[in-house]
A protein has these predicted regions:
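Acidic, aromatic-lined catalytic clefts of primarily extracellular/periplasmic carbohydrate-active enzymes
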Residues: 1-111, 184, 191, 197-200
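Short secondary-structure subsegments characteristic of cysteine-rich extracellular domains
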Residues: 9-20, 122-145
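Generic marker of "main functional regions" within proteins
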Residues: 28, 38-41, 96, 122-127, ...
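Sec-exported extracytoplasmic/periplasmic mature domains
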Residues: 33, 86-96, 113-121, 131, ...
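Long, repeat-rich segments with strong aromatic
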Residues: 93, 98-110, 116-126, 141, ...
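Low-complexity, Gly/Ser/Thr/Pro-rich intrinsically disordered linker/tail segments
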Residues: 131-201
Length: 201
């Protein structure tokens, strides 16, 4: 995929968070250090991660490397490391950002967390365009801010074109939840055709 790389070149991605231009090298180095099941096979590829030219990384055409990542995905060591890195790089910073601005609604936290997951931050060029003061002083202000931000982010993604525009299914999903008034996330989330249960049966 080209998504996530500043030069829009082809690169290897793992899951929804890890790519060669981002945290994939760090994840795989940690996996090898902790002697994951496929560490010995993956280790020789570490030096080649995020190398190449403006069109593609060296590893993007490697079916062998992609197969190794798929196999490693079933390893409990890899699963644990992914959860730990997601918590450290996306979830925890998102919670701090939202709480500092007095957000309290589950959907607000989800939307902020998704922004950190995709952009590693709440982009100031988007947040500064929302016409509601922060920190919010009421639940109504919170809803208005999050609604305005999500609409702005949705338009920004669509205008970007390519893989960024294709990722607007995320913001479209959140706008549907907002339109339904499901700020407490009482129902399943349907994103990009996939149903994600948020409550235990």
């Amino acid at each position: 995929m080209r998504d996530g790389d500043p030069n829009r070149r082809l690169q290897v991605t793992l899951g929804i968070q890890f790519d060669e231009a981002g945290d994939l090298p760090k994840l795989l180095k940690s996996y090898c250090v902790q002697n994951g099941q496929f560490a010995m096979q993956i280790s020789p590829y570490l030096a080649k991660l995020n190398t190449g030219n403006d069109a593609a990384t060296v590893l993007s055409p490697s079916q062998r490397f992609r197969d190794l990542l798929r196999n490693a995905g079933a390893d409990p060591v890899m699963q644990r490391l992914q959860k730990e890195m997601f918590k450290a790089t996306s979830w925890d910073p998102a919670l701090r950002w939202a709480k500092a601005r007095k957000f309290a609604l589950p959907l607000s936290f989800l939307i902020v967390a998704d922004s950190f997951l995709q952009s590693n931050q709440m982009l100031s060029r988007l947040t500064q365009r929302v016409r509601v003061a922060l920190p919010v002083t009421s639940q109504a202000d919170e809803k208005n801010w999050v609604t305005g931000y999500t609409k702005i982010r949705n338009a920004w993604l669509k205008a970007a074109g390519g893989a960024m525009a294709a990722s607007s299914y995320r913001t479209e999903c959140y706008l549907r939840l907002i339109a339904r008034g499901d700020w407490d996330l009482t129902s399943d989330v349907v994103m990009n055709g996939n149903r994600i249960p948020l409550r235990e049966a």
